[in-house]
């Protein structure tokens, strides 16, 4: 019986290693490396230390991207790789609807801190607004959802992130009823997640070798 158990787990371990080794290096690094885990945790830890020192009032807020900043979608990359496919809007939409993304390492502790400090979070993501309910469902599964959070997802192709950031700064568009906000920190995994004009808030960029513009 003992030999059977050892043999069984050996098969599982071998299958996992074989499957893992078939992944592209970028996905494998995110999924398996201690460096990726450590980097993400360090970024969130540093942000926590920095925000402790920042004066927060009713106008203060942080802007966060979602994918590969808060939500870890490496499983999507694994699945399309197994099928021999590349990214497509159709497969991505199906993945988002499943609401099965995990948390980027360190995110949960950071969100717990943000909730205690009562800091407003504004999510600016290129997820389509029609999939807001699935995104909220995913956040609830991960126990980081808060009804006070603001989600500015993409309405259409022309609805770029800088447009939505400007609405936050000026209290226009979808922010008209809420009013303008003073951004004390930005979080993202790509340069498009950060402001070139309004750079008063600190910027925290997460490693994402799986996709991007370069």
What annotation goes with each model-predicted range?
Residues 67-75, 193-195:
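Short acidic, Gly/Ser-rich segments with clustered Asp/Glu that frequently serve as metal-coordination loops
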Residues 2-5, 16-64:
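Non-catalytic pre-domain segments flanking phosphatase-related domains
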Residues 94-122, 129-130:
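Short, acidic loop-to-helix structural element flanking the phosphoryl-transfer center
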Residues 55-62, 121-126, 151, 176-179:
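Surface-exposed patches in mature extracellular/periplasmic domains of secreted proteins
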Residues 25, 31-34, 38, 128-214:
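C-terminal cap/substrate-recognition subdomain and adjoining C-terminal extension
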Residues 71-72, 77-105:
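Metal-dependent phosphoesterase signature
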Residues 62-70, 129-131:
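Acidic helix-start/capping segments at beta-turn-to-alpha-helix junctions
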Residues 52, 56, 76, 112-120, ...:
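Sec-exported extracytoplasmic/periplasmic mature domains
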């Amino acid at each position: 019986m003992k030999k059977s158990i050892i043999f069984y787990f050996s098969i599982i371990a071998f299958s996992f290693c074989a499957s893992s080794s078939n992944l592209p290096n970028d996905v494998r690094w995110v999924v398996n490396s201690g460096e990726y885990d450590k980097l993400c945790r360090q970024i969130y830890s540093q942000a926590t230390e920095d925000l402790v020192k920042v004066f927060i009032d009713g106008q203060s807020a942080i802007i966060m991207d979602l994918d590969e900043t808060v939500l870890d979608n490496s499983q999507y990359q694994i699945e399309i790789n197994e099928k021999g496919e590349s990214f497509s809007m159709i497969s991505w939409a199906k993945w988002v609807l499943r609401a099965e993304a995990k948390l980027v390492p360190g995110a949960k502790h950071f969100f717990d801190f943000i909730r205690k400090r009562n800091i407003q979070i504004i999510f600016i993501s290129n997820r389509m607004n029609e999939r807001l309910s699935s995104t909220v469902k995913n956040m609830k599964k991960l126990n980081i959802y808060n009804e006070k959070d603001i989600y500015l997802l993409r309405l259409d192709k022309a609805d770029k992130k800088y447009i939505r950031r400007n609405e936050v700064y000026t209290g226009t568009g979808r922010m008209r009823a809420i009013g303008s906000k003073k951004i004390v920190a930005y979080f993202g995994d790509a340069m498009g997640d950060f402001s070139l004009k309004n750079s008063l808030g600190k910027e925290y960029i997460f490693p994402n070798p799986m996709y991007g513009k370069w």
